[in-house]
Amino acid sequence: KYIVEHYHILNIIECNDKYIDTQQDTIILMIQNKKLSSNKFYMKISNYTLFGTKQNIIKLQALYKESTTLDALDFDVNVGQIVWNQCKNELTHDQSKTRLIYSSDIVNNKLSKKQYSNKDKKNYIEREGFTEPLLVINRGYGMGKYTFDYCIIQNITYLIENHLICIKPRNKKENIVEMYQKIIHSFQNNKTQEFIELYFGNNAINTSELCKILPIYV
């Protein structure tokens, strides 16, 4: 935002080689110490300023057409609150207790129950849980492309481990499962994958970006 308000962007160049020893993709940002009215190299969405080459900004603007965001749809996005190895004394095999859902429990977009070789890691926890439907996302990579592995949690009492991302409404919605299904359908949209490759590359998507930047097609 400061750059946009105080400087003129001369050019943004994507570098094809990796930066020294980090193997990170890099760009060259060329700015001039004066302000001119030009928005060829950036756009604004949800109070964020997105930078890119002129070609990429044009593509991003096209991908945002007829889209919304989870934030605009009145959803919050956060990570699960349970760090399992910090509450080992509360974990149990007792199936009458609250189900603790780990990232590895989401397989092929369905909830499974994994048996762990680590005996301290158990599938249930002696805490009060939640019962309302919840959409969880396990961020991952597959065949060089960023992929979502997601699942709607419902009809059980649960808590979520901190390696999963949770999407939930800020206020109660009667048709919440139907709305979750529409969000999932948006994740499956080819335009979503195109946006992710263009904007995020192979970088991790944080909760703020998922909530306020990723376009949702519903």
Model-derived features with residue positions:
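Signature of N6-adenine DNA methyltransferases within the class I
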Residues: K1-Q81, N85
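Polybasic, glycine- and aromatic-enriched phosphate-binding surface used to engage nucleic acids
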Residues: L63-V218
